[in-house]
Curated annotation (Swiss-Prot):
Lipid bilayer topology: Peripheral membrane protein
Glycosylated residues (UniProt): 7, 9, 41, 86, 111, 276
Pfam families hit by this protein: Tektin
Self-association state and partner proteins as the record states: Microtubule inner protein component of sperm flagellar doublet microtubules. Interacts with TEKT1, TEKT2, TEKT4 and TEKT5. Interacts with CCDC38.
UniProt KW Ubl conjugation keyword: yes
Keywords per UniProt: Cell projection, Cilium, Coiled coil, Cytoplasm, Cytoplasmic vesicle, Cytoskeleton, Flagellum, Glycoprotein, Membrane, Ubl conjugation
Primary gene name: Tekt3
Residues in coiled coil: 419-456
Protein name listed in UniProt: Tektin-3
InterPro entries in the cross-refs: Tektin-like (IPR048256), Tektins (IPR000435)
Record-level GO cellular component terms: acrosomal membrane; acrosomal vesicle; axonemal A tubule inner sheath; axonemal microtubule; cytoplasm; microtubule cytoskeleton; outer acrosomal membrane; sperm flagellum
Summary of the function given for this chain in its UniProt record: Microtubule inner protein (MIP) part of the dynein-decorated doublet microtubules (DMTs) in cilia and flagellar axoneme. Forms filamentous polymers in the walls of ciliary and flagellar microtubules. Required for normal sperm mobility.
Family: Belongs to the tektin family.
Organism: Rattus norvegicus (Rat)
Length: 490
């Protein structure tokens, strides 16, 4: 027998090798008449499920009738009580010693059975208490583990919420800078259009004024500057769009993780507060064998940590892109305004040069007109002088012609004749000289007229240039967008 207080693995809980029957062995038919009890065949199975196993296990170890059976075999026939068929010898089967011995054996077996039962009850009670305390401790440990799990989930949930708030703020800020970039890109279309229209209008200059001057060079530089600025803005806009997509992807992962954390927190918190008396507690057979887990604590924490780190990385890249975009807008606005001012200065200088040239042309034209007038007056004077000299020539020639009609010897080559001849030559030479001067004056007048026409054409060209540069180009450039509009604030 095991000592008192042993566990359920004590020997009384396990059958020991014994006889397959709880009754004494039955001998032959002749010897059976000397036994205490008559022979009877068993009419029931010894292995039926309704019999108490503890009793029969004990009976296997301590058969109550075995001593009597063995004793009855040793009793001599002279001491045995005969049956009715042998009444002539004795009327009893056993002696008082057998009776006392049998009673003592019964008492001993009763004491042993009670002792075993008492020990079983004590061990069972202690087992119940031990298992109860063990189960309570296990449940408390599970509750504590659930509490720690709830704390872990709550911690990561707070981290996700904090990072999600930061990411939402960064996404909104990047969206704002993207909108500013789009507005700034739209605002650059007007300066580009103005510069191109200025170049187009300046193609309508005439003559020598169709020159590749400083204003045109600055206009071409302005077009290149605006196009370069637009290209940089488009590249940053594409980067902002891609970064926004990355931010929203990271934000979506955080929101999904947060939703999972909230559901897990709700479930684990409910499990933490479940008690034996709680509503909804029931049996779920085999649930402990179902392993639907997809992560371990390390991979679980790493998953959320990776999401947070990814969000932080995307947020840092977004902040860097915002800073670069902000600086780009300021640089672009300054570059465009600097080039705008250079173009305006070039236009101002060119307009001043044109105005000065126009004024000088006016002066030359005035002088030319004055000279034309004086030349015309001189021509009139020459013509009048020629006309006057023609009268002298006619008188002298008439005199000579009349003197040719003198008779005979009167045709004398006298002083008067010689003087008249000289007078004719002198007056004719004078007329020829005056006619030459008249021709020269007329040629000069033609030259002056050509100069006048040239000056008038140049004056018209300069007036057209001034109209294009001053009235058209500079008037369009008065509507250049402000710096605030170029950086996208308006």
């Amino acid at each position: 027998m095991e000592p008192l207080g042993s566990t359920l693995t004590a020997t009384y809980a396990h059958p020991q090798p014994a006889a397959t029957n709880f009754l004494p062995a039955i001998g032959t038919l002749t010897s059976s008449y000397r036994n205490r009890f008559p022979h009877r065949n068993l009419t029931h199975s010894l292995s039926l499920p309704w019999r108490p196993s503890t009793y029969y296990k004990t009976a296997y170890n301590y058969p109550t009738l075995a001593p009597l059976s063995s004793t009855s075999q040793s009793v001599c026939e002279s001491t045995m009580l005969p049956f009715v068929s042998n009444r002539t010898t004795l009327f009893t089967r056993y002696t008082p010693d057998d009776w006392y011995r049998s009673t003592l054996v019964g008492f001993q077996e009763s004491n042993c059975s009670r002792h075993n039962s008492e020990r079983l009850r004590v061990d069972t009670s202690r087992l119940i208490q031990d298992k109860y305390q063990q189960i309570r401790k296990t449940q408390a440990d599970s509750t504590q583990n659930l509490g720690e799990r709830v704390n872990d989930i709550a911690f990561w949930k707070s981290e996700i919420i904090h990072e999600l708030d930061e990411m939402i703020g960064e996404t909104n800020a990047l969206t704002d800078i993207k909108r500013r970039l789009e507005r700034g890109l739209i605002e650059t279309d007007a300066p580009l259009q103005v510069a191109r229209e200025c170049l187009f209008h300046r193609e309508k200059r005439m003559g020598i004024d169709l020159v590749h001057d400083e204003a045109e060079k600055e206009l071409l530089t302005e077009v290149e500057t605006v196009l370069c600025c637009q290209e940089r803005m488009r590249r940053h806009l594409d980067k902002a769009i891609a970064q926004l997509a990355s931010d929203r992807s990271a934000q979506h992962e955080l929101e999904k993780d947060l939703s999972d954390k909230q559901a897990a927190l709700r479930i684990d918190d409910k499990c933490k507060h479940l008690r034996n008396t709680s509503q909804g507690v029931s049996y779920f057979r085999g649930v402990e064998n179902v392993d639907a887990t997809v992560s371990v604590p390390e991979s679980w924490a790493k998953f959320t940590d990776d999401n947070v780190l990814r969000s932080q990385s995307e947020r840092a890249a977004s902040a860097k892109l915002r800073e670069d975009t902000e600086n780009l807008l300021i640089v672009i606005a300054n570059e465009m305004w600097n080039q705008f001012n250079k173009v305006n200065v070039a236009f101002t200088n060119r307009i001043a040069e044109t105005v000065d040239a126009k004024n000088k042309i006016h002066i030359h034209l005035s002088k030319t007109l004055q000279e034309i007038f004086q030349t015309e007056m001189a021509i009139e004077s020459i013509r009048k002088a020629i006309k006057e000299k023609s009268a002298f020539l006619k008188v002298a020639q008439t005199r000579l012609d009349e003197r040719t009609r003198r008779p005979n010897i009167e045709l004398c080559r006298d002083i008067a004749q010689l003087r008249l001849v000289n007078e004719v030559y002198e007056v004719d030479e004078t007329i020829q000289t005056l006619q030459q001067r008249l021709r020269d004056s007329e040629d000069t007048l033609q030259s002056l007229a050509h100069t006048k026409a040239t000056l008038e054409h140049d004056l018209a060209v300069k007036a057209n240039t001034l109209y294009i540069d001053q009235e058209k180009c500079m008037s369009m450039r008065n509507s250049y967008p402000s710096t605030l509009r170029l950086v996208g604030f308006c």
